[in-house]
Amino acid sequence: MTKPDIPYSDGFWWSNDGLRLHFRDYPARPENAHRPPVICIPGLTRNARDFEQVAAKLAGDWRVICVDLRGRGDSAYAKDPMSYVPLTYVQDMEALLQEQKIERFVSIGTSLGGLITMLLASTRPGRVVGALLNDVGPQIEPAGLARIRDYVGQGRSFPTWMHAARALSEVQGAVFPGNSVSDWLDMAKKAMKVGPGGRIVYDYDMKIAEPFAVPGGEAGVDLWPTLAGLAPVPVLIVRGAMSDLFSVDTAQRMLGVLPQGRLLTVANKGHAPSLEEPEVADAIATLLGEVDAMALATQA
């Protein structure tokens, strides 16, 4: 898969504890500047590059902001590893929203990014005007959490990109059975970087694993009540059919809380769908159409 040739600018903002954090900013055309921006928030070990294809499809029609959470990508690493928890990420996002003077936005959150989305919606109702929750809900399955605890922060490195891609396929091949060599290479180049010694390394601070070493350290707060913040708006719930992190039961329970919620199950994918799947791209277009329709209804 080739890298989209879509221009973006690199933006930076400061966290409350003095970290310089990074985002990619894909602009909207002037005639679409009235629309709320789409903010993409990645998963635990991931970064802004995960949303290249999504941003390429939406840029121009919408402003798209893809963030690197603290300790990932081009954002600074935290001085205190125990700040690698959802409530701190929410504070960081609050600082971004304030710096960019964003009052309303659409949130696309994968895994951890979805948890952050729910928390942002609950702390100030009305500012999240639409959401995509990618393979995550208020309840995380123990098997998936155990798998994450086993691999995060391992600090592996590889001599070539092909070695890195092969390692990913060995670990995740069972939940992405349809991936080609090109797909694995694309995944590797989004998740990893060339390290100082020339070897391929994961593009995150290995210390993000430290909260997982504390019993209950990754648990945070009960997230079921936060769904109320998304109840008034359109929500697309994407679930990988082979996910071990996000169960069918949790997804169905969420639909009972979200009157405008829709569930899309992506076949032959585990945790988490890339959002580049054709059916997901179509569903994102529908979601944003619903956001537009709600805005027009409010103005009428």
Question: Where are the regions a protein language model picked out?
Answer:
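The conserved beta1-alpha1 loop
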Residues: I39-G43, R239
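Active-site loop/oxyanion-hole signature of alpha/beta-hydrolase fold enzymes
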Residues: R24-P30, E52-A59, C66-I108, T286
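Conserved alpha/beta-hydrolase catalytic His-Asp/Glu region
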Residues: P159-V214
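Conserved hydrolase catalytic core segment
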Residues: E103-P142
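Catalytic histidine-centered segment of alpha/beta-hydrolase-like enzymes
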Residues: K269-P278
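Conserved serine/cysteine hydrolase catalytic core
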Residues: V194-G256
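Alpha/beta-hydrolase fold catalytic core
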Residues: M1-V38, G60-D61, I102, E279, ...
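Serine-hydrolase catalytic-loop signature spanning alpha/beta hydrolases and amidase-signature enzymes
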Residues: G43-Q53, V64
